[in-house]
Amino acid sequence: GNVFLRVQQIDKFRAEGLLLTQNTMAAKFSNCRQLIRRTLHDNAELREDENIQKVLEVLKEGIDKVYEAESIEEIVGIEGFCAKNYFSIFNKLITNKKVDFEFQLRTKHPPLDPVNALLSFIYTLATNEMAAALETVGLDSYIGYCHTLRSGRSSLACDLVEEIRCIVERFVITLLNLKIVGEKD
């Protein structure tokens, strides 16, 4: 790799890590809101759901709060609160219900149900693709601006995937709603 590019990357993240994190999380929350609104557009029966409306408001407030935050750690806390609320209504976005694909709670290590397994698997694919793309252009995928450095973790890839996680979520919702994935898959 190019050591000069790596030094520039580190300097940039030290100088602008907070702003980059603010922009990434604001975009993530905005994209989550768009995913929910798209589902509401396609499913009139969900439009008056108070919990869904509350989550839309929490995500909107989250956008404002990340720009008021004074540290990356504070933003991580805001993101955790918004994610918990977002996933509290995720099962409602899966409109073609099947017993095998009931979603209750986001679990990761390990995923405890088929929906969480799908989410984790496709997030991993997206993160690996992002890491490969970063390395292709000479960036160090292990040096990020939001995710803390940890041996073996592509922190920058994780940072950049945050903004597009809703694409993975929409893909999983579509797989389930169109019955592309079944219980035997």
List each language-model region with its residue ranges.
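Active-site helix-to-loop segments that bind/position phosphate- or nucleotide-bearing substrates
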Residues: 3-185
